Amino acid sequence: MGREFIPLFEDWAATYDQTVQGLDIQYKEAFRGYDHILDAIVRKSGTHVLEFGPGTGNLTAKLLDAGKTVFGIEPSPAMRKLASDKLSGRTEIVDGDFLTFPEPPFQADTIVSSYAFHHLTDEEKRAAIKQYGKYLHLHDKIVFADTVFENAQAYQQAIDKARSQGFYQLANDLETEHYPTLDALKEMFTAEGFAVRFTQQNDFVWIMEAIKR
């Protein structure tokens, strides 16, 4: 359920905001347009939002600034602490993950996440989408931004390119985490009654908007 990556985020928490600002050259392209990507998620979201993997609270803050009600689910204690400090009590960030989490204190009309869904295996992704499909009402939506590849060949090319650039940490991440392809995600969402569309944001990240039919 992605919890095997908690030690990574415990270590990364203190420097995560510097990374998303493009200060780590290996991840600069993945976070190119970061603020624009988060703003796009906010625009596509409804009024009551369930957020998975808020990390240090960057998307959460933008959602709250837009007047939305937010309930955050974050498995990393270090990330929860940073998010709580950043948000100054404006909303609650609780322990949980994409599959196991406390029930929100409201009925969410949108489920969002940024840079996190790839921590689930394909089987777990499918189970999560199924769970959300049962929870959401007609016309509610899922809006995720994450690294996705057009196909398996593009995935391998990204790994090879990272290695050729000397970006060995990035290459290792690409090889050990569970990055999906567009076709795989489309099949998962469609199987659970969602109409989904994908919009590319940079060489790595796509926004997926899935509307419950």
Swiss-Prot record:
One of its GO terms (biological process) is rRNA methylation. The keyword Iron does not apply. InterPro entries: Methyltransf_25, rRNA_Ade_methylase_Trfase_N, SAM-dependent_MTases_sf, Uncharacterised_MeTfrase_YrrT. SMART domains: rADc. It is an enzyme of class 2 (transferase). Keywords: Methyltransferase, S-adenosyl-L-methionine, Transferase. S-adenosyl-L-methionine binds at residues 53, 74, 97. Its EC number is 2.1.1.-. GO terms for cellular component: cytosol. Induction: By methionine. Repressed by sulfate and cysteine. It holds the Pfam family Methyltransf_25. GO terms for molecular function: rRNA (adenine-N6,N6-)-dimethyltransferase activity. The keyword Isomerase does not apply. Could be a S-adenosyl-L-methionine-dependent methyltransferase. This is Uncharacterized methyltransferase YrrT. It comes from Bacillus subtilis (strain 168).
